[in-house]
Amino acid sequence: MSKILTTASGAPVADNQNSRSAGPRGPLLLDDFHLIEKLAHFNRENIPERRVHAKGSGAYGTFTVTRDITGYTSAKLFEQVGKQTETFLRFSTVGGERGSADTERDPRGFAVKFYTEEGNWDIVGNNTPVFFIRDPLKFPDFIHTQKRHPQSNLKNAQIFWDSWSHSPEALHQVTILFSDRGIPDGYRHMHGFGSHTYSLINAQGERTWVKWHFKTQQGIKNLAPADAARLAGTDPDYAQRDLFEAIERGDYPRWTVCIQVMSEAEAASRDENPFDVTKTWSQKDYPLIEVGVLELNRNPLNYFAEVEQAAFGPSNMVPGVGLSPDRMLQGRVFAYADAHRYRVGTNHQQLPVNAPRCPVNSYQRDGSMATGSYGSAPNYEPNSYAAAPKQSPRHAEPALALNGSADRYDHREDADYYSHAGALFRLMSDEQKALLISNIAGTMAGVSENVIQRQLQYFFKADPAYGEGIAKGLGINLA
């Protein structure tokens, strides 16, 4: 027997085909509450799209510990080899709108939510180990260059190359973006990275700096520019389709989860800033340590409820993991949580996809769409109620040693913008170098001469062959 159709308030609907009217040809009636409710709700079905990472795909899965790292962290999800934790992972493009193609040249978001017994822990990463900028003060400016021109409403190569030519620290990420890895073949065939430096804290209160890596077990596959352009027209949801259908047929994608670790003493003695997200840590000096396996094995039942409303943020942490002085990371701690409060709502953590799987006891109350609000329990602290939530000093992080005066320090005092990009270029095969040069020259064609000349010097500083290749691709005579 089928269910009875109801209004949102549960009243049975007698007729869902015809509006109430004054006679068969007369005007409609305002007392048709079913019509009014249906139209009013339809007008409000959409929520604001994400300012970045608007186009995305998601799936549930598990994280399984394969190596004991309790020497580094007291987080309970790592307490035993073989332990499994439920996860939700959202992939995305960065600059495109919600209806943009999955095959655009763009970094990919790689955001993982771990539903642990101590709360939700999020690693909000990308498919690249670095980023374009170091300071969050420049993030709105940077994102504006990745969006549409304010007059023409078109994507504009002039503005993003102009921005990069004034931001030489972007060169490392630009080199990755225009390499063969700039257009992954779907989401299953790419690595993920936490990108930032984070911290792990063990039971003795000792802090270790860490970088997170997610190595695809499906193998790296990328799309040639011509294939990506074709798919953008014939199957713009290519990556979404590939991920969804693979999971539906039981071909579950997996990633090997690894860390790099650095002691506080090592970090303090390094000339290079270990908290600079435009640079990587040498895997020769800081080798990858396998930690576990991440597997995606269940598709969401409702895209809007579980993917569109999913809210990730680096402020979501659990005991045993922490942040670092990485400037971009610290900016994101505020920006992401604030974006969710605007986009999804004050109580976005109460939605099923965002809700912790452990008890939540706080003094936060009310707000739009609040559920429960802890009944008659006190809404202030400290209080005299024995059963009310109390702070837990044993979960305090160890003190972080700092030095220096409060000021606006010039992050460009570290002017080594080129060595990492140059090293990456020299690691590439001749075929990969040719593709990189072709991709860059193709997008720079038509950009103003002053921008080209300013950017060109960065390529030369990274590696003379890099600069010569771009110059030749642009038809610039260096003689």
Curated annotation (Swiss-Prot):
Q: Which domain of life is it from?
A: Bacteria
Binding-site list for heme: 336
Q: Which SUPFAM superfamilies does this chain map to?
A: Heme-dependent catalase-like
Q: Where is this region: Disordered?
A: 1-25, 350-376
Name the chemical reaction catalysed here.
2 H2O2 = O2 + 2 H2O
Q: Show the coiled coil region(s).
A: none
Cofactor(s) recorded for this entry are:
heme
Record's family? Belongs to the catalase family.
Q: What does this protein do?
A: The major expressed catalase protein in strain Corvallis in stationary phase. Decomposes hydrogen peroxide into water and oxygen; serves to protect cells from the toxic effects of hydrogen peroxide.
Q: Write the protein's name.
A: Catalase A
The taxonomic lineage of its organism, from the top, reads: Bacteria, Pseudomonadati, Pseudomonadota, Gammaproteobacteria, Pseudomonadales
